[in-house]
Design a protein with these regions (language model features):
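A short, aromatic-enriched beta-strand patch in the conserved N-lobe beta-sheet
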Residues: 78-81
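Conserved short submotifs of the Hanks-type protein kinase catalytic core
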Residues: 85-101
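AlphaC helix of the protein kinase catalytic domain
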Residues: 102-112
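Activation segment signature within eukaryotic-like protein kinase domains
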Residues: 120-121
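Catalytic-loop of the protein kinase fold
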Residues: 132-151
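Conserved activation segment of eukaryotic-like protein kinases, specifically the C-terminal portion
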Residues: 176-190
Length: 227
């Protein structure tokens, strides 16, 4: 059920329209006081898995993005909490990327040429290198064709890593890793044993590159019931 109606307000942001219902959040396009378009995610805190929060109760997706600044990572704008119908919700405001996901691209074009794959992959690797070499390294955990957007607002498309819902700090316990809802076709073997690392992200990028080149992931048998 859509929680925010058109023209309703969240802090300094006015809702323009509902975008989609995700596994853990709803997303909207909003405008700030200056009239700039932004992307807002709304989280029902009571429905999020406990592994989505740090030891102080802060939502990890917000904590990680707030301190991440890189041209190949979606830009953090603001965050906070609101009450809707006596329930606490967290919101995260991000830049609104004018473009499409790699999944959208494949739906239209079926596959991508090798030069574009090489150039886009270099940019994504730069973003991952930034995350993996932070003082407190971060693992994204969900690099897929759905979670890379091409920013088409300039002369040259710029790939940007989005959706940090499964991102974790590398030094966290494996007990904080919850792979429920992840696409198993992109997961490294160790992830099925609840171990995640920077190498897991590189593996997922390799699967993404294969998918872009051939139009299918390297394996696509029915493993959705694997536990």
């Amino acid at each position: 059920m859509q929680l925010l109606e058109k023209n309703s307000r969240v802090k300094d942001y006015t809702v323009q329209f509902f975008i989609k219902q995700g596994i853990n959040a709803q997303s909207y396009r909003v405008k700030n006081k200056e009239g700039k378009n932004l992307f807002l995610k709304l989280f029902n805190c009571s429905k999020l898995h406990r592994t989505s929060f740090d030891e102080n109760g802060e939502l990890l997706e917000i904590k990680i993005l707030r301190t991440s600044k890189h041209p190949n990572i979606v830009k953090y704008i603001d965050s906070g909490e609101i009450i809707i119908e006596q329930q606490k919700f967290a919101f995260l405001t991000l830049e609104f990327i004018t473009g499409e996901t790699l999944s959208d691209f494949l739906t239209r074009e079926k596959h991508m040429n090798s030069y574009e794959i090489k150039e886009y992959s270099k940019s994504i690797l730069n973003g991952l290198k930034y995350l993996h070499t932070l003082p407190d390294p971060v693992v994204h955990n969900e690099i897929t064709i759905q979670n890379i957007m091409l920013d088409l607002s300039g002369n040259v498309p710029i790939p940007k890593i989005i959706d940090f819902g499964y991102a974790r700090f590398f030094n966290q316990s494996s007990k904080t890793y919850n792979r429920e809802g992840l696409n198993p076709h992109y997961l490294a073997n160790e992830c099925f044993n609840n171990f995640f690392s920077p190498q897991s992200d590189i593996f997922s990028l390799g699967v993404t590159m294969f998918h872009l080149l051939y139009g299918l992931p390297p394996w696509f048998s029915e493993i959705s019931n694997y536990r």
